[in-house]
Amino acid sequence: MGTYRKRFNEKARSGHMAKLKELKRIRNKQFTRQDENDERVENPDSAPAESSTTEPNANAEILEPLTEEEKKMKKRKLQELFTPKESKVSRLKKKRLDKFIEHQLKREERKTIIGKLQDYKIDTSLLTSSKRLGEGRQTKKEEFKEALSLERQGRGNEQTNEILYEEYEPKVWDEYGEGGSSEDDDGEDDFEASFGSMPKPTDNEEKKSSGFIDHRPAKFGGSGLSFGFSNIKVINKESKTPKKKYNWRQRVEMEELKKHGKEDEMDFDTTSEDDDEEEDQEEEDKMHPSENPLEEVESADSETGSEKFDQNDVANEFKDWANQEIKKLEGRDQELVTPTLNIDYKPIIRKEDLDDGLQEAYVPINENSTRKAFYVEVSRSDEIQKARIQLPVFGEEHKIMEAIHHNDVVIICGETGSGKTTQVPQFLYEAGFGAEDSPDYPGMVGITQPRRVAAVSMAERVANELGDHGHKVGYQIRFDSTAKEDTKVKFMTDGVLLREMMHDFKLTKYSSIIIDEAHERNINTDILIGMLSRCVRLRAKLHKENPIEHKKLKLIIMSATLRVSDFSENKTLFPIAPPVLQVDARQFPVSIHFNRRTAFNYTDEAFRKTCKIHQKLPPGAILVFLTGQQEITHMVKRLRKEFPFKKNSKYNKDLETPVSKMGINSKTTDLEAEDIDFSVQVIDQDKFKSAIRYEEDEGNSGNGEDEEDEEEEGFEEVLTEGQTANDPLYVLPLYSLLPTKEQMRVFQKPPQGSRLCIVATNVAETSLTIPGVRYVVDSGRSKERKYNESNGVQSFEVGWVSKASANQRSGRAGRTGPGHCYRLYSSAVFEHDFEQFSKPEILRMPVESIVLQMKSMAIHNIINFPFPTPPDRVALSKAIQLLQYLGALDNKEMITEDGKKMSLFPLSPRFSKMLLVSDEKACLPYIVAIVSALSVGDPFINEFELGINEISRKPNPDENLDDKIREHDESTPGMDPELKKELRSKFYKSRSQFSKLDKFSDVFRLLSVVSAMDYVPKEQKEIFMKKNFLRGKLMEEIVKLRKQLMYIIKSNTSKENIAVVIRNEDLKSDIPSVIQIKLLKQMICAGFVDHVAVRADVLFPDDAKITNRTSIINIPYIPVLATRTPNIEDCFVYIHPTSILNNLGEMPPKYMLYYSLHLGGNNKTRMNTLCDIASTPLANIARKGLLLTYSKPLTGQGLKTVNLSPTERYCYVVPRFGSTVDNDLKIGWDLNPIAVHQKKQKGQWTVIKFITRKGFQTITGEEKEKK
């Protein structure tokens, strides 16, 4: 019979099953959880003895680990379990078995610990929410709620008992008849009669009595009232008398009394009656405790508050009584009576003492200032003093001067008309600025103005107001100066001060500088403020080191608007923000009236509105804002024609001025940039015709127009007595090119019985204050010079003004009384299209002149210069590139010797370069004349301004003549055809007379007329200019600039420059020779080397096809370095119609130099040509710059390279002008081959000089002879 075979791994399986049962038992144990205080014990027979001894309580606070004996016993049992009986075990197996047993023991211990942890559980309802962490102390309500919850859970302690339960002190009642009153007995009898007699407690009941009232129901052993606790021990305490209560005010008073050694007055705060009342109230509270503890707390708080209030009142009353008694005892109870004067006194009411509701501006005060008082006495007439008192800034003199004394930089904001321009310099002068014996400010007072007219007029007015010190006021502008050695107040343009800082950066002659009209933000103003900010800090530093030798410099920036954040908040400009003082202008209310619709033709709308104001509204001057000279001249003529003076009036002759005739053909001609509205679309034919009809039918308006007028606002007033709708209108123009004498007429009173009307540009916004203006007609537009950085085109564009400018214009109507401003645009356009402030000029103009001046002042890092508004980096890089082309800067952007010389001239760097290279073959006088003419402007009056342009010729198919030219004759019917023909003949004869020097060069026509003017006698100059159709004002400017340039050149080149005098005879020059003309073209090219254009058919014959019928003004050119586009026609530029080349009659030159590019009305870019240039001279001029590169030496066709040494050679190369060969983004072209002398420097062949053909042949022959 076979034996039973044990199953594989049976012992392990049995052990595993035992473990599972044990684990199941442990898990089921949590469902039979016993109470902690339960003393039941399991049956010892149901479990082995070890379990009762080894199984500890899982919920015990401390679990004791197994002892060493217990661990050994357990290990021995495991060994017996796994070791078979009577079997031999090898040493290795035994070692493995020990390791296994040790591992199993650790597993058992781990399972035991995990099982114990599973058995341990807590009630999560007892935990506190984490969201309440950090709340701090609990309120009484929260404490009571938590204590009640713990009590219900059976977890109460002494702390919860203190919160939930209150102690009750049993009161001992006296027996009846002992010490009691009859009133008390009566009260008790009444109580017994009402509620019955109270049962007396027995001795047992007294022992069981509790200090708490048991409010449980009667069936549970309570009193039957409510829930309560009867298991609280009774605490008997002796009754204590309530302590005297003090509030915090009484404690403070008590401490003060103790310090001063006085008696404690707190003893009088309460009385015995009050104490008795308090005791009775406390006893009553103990007898009837509140059910809600919170109500008890609140009631206690309210009672203590009322109690404190009552105690304070009692204490104060007693204190007052005690003080009165003390005064009686000391004899101080008698009242002193002040004697009264029987005089009628009227208090003086000063305007400055009244509260105006304005907040005073904060002005930092230098507490360490040691300035001594110093003033200059000035005597003025009563009339001038009264006029000064009426100015708003006069009342702010103290505040302004205090700010100036305590701060090196001050900003003053005041609208035009506040008097800041004329009064602030007088404040400074009277405070000692400019006085030689002044201890702190002995230097001059300098005032800069952006316009020459403002500098001259303000200097005259301040000199008049300074009375006996008026001779110490002078001005200095570009061509005129009245400043002397004793001048203490100097008005000047900002360019003059910039020039002075180049020679004296510290401005040692000045003690204060005033920058006026800073809100205009032109280039000179921005660069001045940036340099002066450094100068102020430098002078302050030097003054700190040596106060006697160096004095501080004060800088005052004045603006007509509140746009000063670029100055005050610019930490780079002013590390410490300067104080900003605001001066209110003398402003009356101004009613602003917007148009319902924005008129397309704003000039006609301005004319209609002006006529309506004159015919319907009371007296008052009218100020009309337009964009340019041509619009103003046309408007003046229309208004004078509509409201004329009588025929025999003397004012008719005064008002007779030539008026420009407008005739524009967009296809054949371009006027001057000032006369063209580049940003406004060309008016189409229908609107143009309707405008003409409106102009013709202006006087015959129908009923429909009257109905429209009635709907307009701002015409509620009526004419006054003596006024009629046909009164004459005294119309005057005002623009920058107008002579100063004509500009001053706006300040004169109009003739009797007429109304003043001024038609002006934005010059009248801030620079000049015109008196008597009550009505303002604002077109909302202005003409500004803009510069296109992408193509270098400058243009005058008409666009919307800023909101700040519009507010300035409207403010003109409120200077003398309430006024009206009529805006020729809608409020929607004003809010949507108008910018808040205009763009600074430094961001819309080329900055090469500024960069060169700053480089000459050793300001090399232009980026870090403290500009109020930093210029665009693209504009700066283009300016630096141009200066490198001209040779003013080297490759490292450092100024060269030529650049330093160029910076001495107050001109564009281009003109400075021309003057620098003009000292050859006696060409200097010619270059001076050319530069002066180009700087000032074209002095010729063109045929379109005269109205003599020929329109009877047959139209050219390429020109596409439209109806505008034909309608031009209709617009000028006053000129007789024969007279027009004769005038045209004289015009062309005059032009041909000045065009004989060179038929390809417009610049030599300018040279001819300027040189011819030198030989005309002084008394015949006016006739000469009229006869030759020249602008008198521009010719005078050209003569003055020539004298200034000659003076600068001679003073910097002659040895004795102090005695340099320029006379009119020094300006005379002979007719230039042929050689001089060739040299002059190269000198002009030196200044405009990057303004070279090549005829388009030379580079792109397929794209630019020129036929015999193509007019000269339609032949395209391409500028050098123009950006190459897929459509090459986008790069084309064309000759200006007023050029001398227009009457050439042959193909224009291959290469042309141009002065500037202008965008015409037909979207064609026109170039104002200067002269032609040949290939070799162009290469000779461009070789010093970065525009010329060279090919490798040419070989073949008899051309050989002559090697003088391994590092020197003579050869022919092909120069390339413009972009390099491998550059497809810019335009460039090859010039004619030329012989050069090259040397090898740093591994590259460099051109040293050019060699003529004869010179190269000579060198080649000499080399052959040597061989």
Swiss-Prot record:
One annotated GO molecular function: helicase activity
Ranges annotated as biased composition (Basic and acidic residues): 7-25, 32-43, 202-217
A single GO cellular-component term on record: mitochondrion
Xref: Gene3D superfamilies: 1.20.120.1080, P-loop containing nucleotide triphosphate hydrolases (3.40.50.300)
UniProt main location, coarse: nucleus
Motif interval(s): DEAH box: 516-519
Keyword Chloroplast set for record: no
PROSITE patterns from the UniProt entry: DEAH_ATP_HELICASE, HELICASE_ATP_BIND_1, HELICASE_CTER
Keywords: ATP-binding, Helicase, Hydrolase, Nucleotide-binding, Nucleus, Phosphoprotein, Ribonucleoprotein, Ribosome biogenesis, RNA-binding, rRNA processing
Top-level class of the enzyme under EC nomenclature: hydrolase
BP GO terms, sorted: maturation of SSU-rRNA; maturation of SSU-rRNA from tricistronic rRNA transcript (SSU-rRNA, 5.8S rRNA, LSU-rRNA); ribosome biogenesis
Domain of life where this protein originates: Eukaryota
EC number(s) given by UniProt: 3.6.4.13
Positions of the Helicase C-terminal domain: 675-858
Cellular location(s): Nucleus, Nucleolus
Region Disordered: start-end pairs: 1-67, 168-233, 255-313, 693-720, 955-976
Acidic residues composition bias: residue spans: 175-192, 264-284, 695-719
Binding of ATP, residues: 414-421
Pfam families named among the record's database cross-references: DEAD, HA2_C, HA2_N, Helicase_C, OB_NTP_bind
General function of this protein: Probable ATP-binding RNA helicase. Required for 18S rRNA synthesis. May play a role in restructuring of the pre-rRNA.
UniProt subunit comment: Interacts with snoRNA U3. Component of the ribosomal small subunit (SSU) processome composed of at least 40 protein subunits and snoRNA U3.
Other known facts: Present with 2000 molecules/cell in log phase SD medium.
Protein name: Probable ATP-dependent RNA helicase DHR1
Species of the source: Saccharomyces cerevisiae (strain ATCC 204508 / S288c)
